[in-house]
Amino acid sequence: FMMPYWNPYNEDGSIASTKDDSWTGTNQNPLDWMRNNPVSYKKYKVLSTLYAEVNPIKGLTIKSQFAADYAHMTAFRQSFPSFSTNNGSGNAGRSSNDRLSLTITNTANYMFTLREKHSFNFLLGQEGVDAQSEGFSISMRGQNNDLLTNISNGTLAASWSDTAAGTLYSYSYLSFFGRGEYNYDGRYYVDFSLRTDASSRFGKDNRWGAFWSVGLMWNLKKEKFLNECKWLTTTRLALSTGTSGNSDIGYYAWQSLVKGGMDYMGETGIYPAQSGNPDLSWEKTWTTNLALHLGFWNRINLDVELYNKK
């Protein structure tokens, strides 16, 4: 924290520095520190989507979609040797990271109506995701000239990693899903869904998880006994229950891992980094929800919900 009377600038507008004793605060002037420890970032990103859609018969839509998400990121960090706290020894570091995610989705959606009042909507689908990331970082120290504060001018390796901050990973998802909806005359609604998902973040015996949901809704405003209530413009009662899954854990949390980057007496080495658990599996949540949706004069809405989640 800075005291309010510490001025980061000199009277002539230049940045106050500990080098010439123009900085009167403790430690370093933050602006001076940033000037002598610059960091530059670059990021290039490409998003692309390609799809094909056909309607072989009335009400049936078959769609296949392919998406690619690519990103290339670099960073260059410098710490100039002339900066007071560096004692004449600079530091320079570079890092680079490439990430690619590929997604393919295939769906078949069939909608039809019988006798004008019975409406159906069915969906079947599949989705696969494959993601890869790799990167590196290196830092060299010992530079003795501000103009030559680069990797090649360092004399000692300060740090190095071919997994730069966890950027080396790969994972995959595979999903199959289905959904069905039915409504009678816009009054009674029923829907259900079923899906099964596999994640590479779990061991081979626990990668698959199955999840389902069922929902009911009654549009009371369509009933005759509410037709005369002009002030009540929306009245819906809904009940749903179902399960969902969560796989948001480390990419290799189920595996026992070792890690490099250690050294002993000048020799490189590895050490145990993680104790794996092959029994890790999907986190499952079961949610039941009861909701009442009300609308008054087409101006005021009121939603009341009760739910139980476990």
Protein language model annotation of sequence segments:
Residues 174-184:
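Structured alpha-helical segments in the cores of large, soluble enzyme domains
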Residues 175, 209-211:
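Transmembrane beta-barrel architecture of outer membranes
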Residues 1-45, 65-174, 220-287, 293, ...:
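Surface-exposed loop/interface segments of Gram-negative outer-membrane beta-barrel transport/assembly proteins
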Residues 214-217:
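Outer-membrane beta-barrel "beta-signal"
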Residues 200-206:
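Solvent-exposed loop/turn segments connecting transmembrane beta-strands
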Residues 190-199, 239-241:
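Transmembrane beta-strand segments that form the barrel wall of outer-membrane beta-barrel proteins
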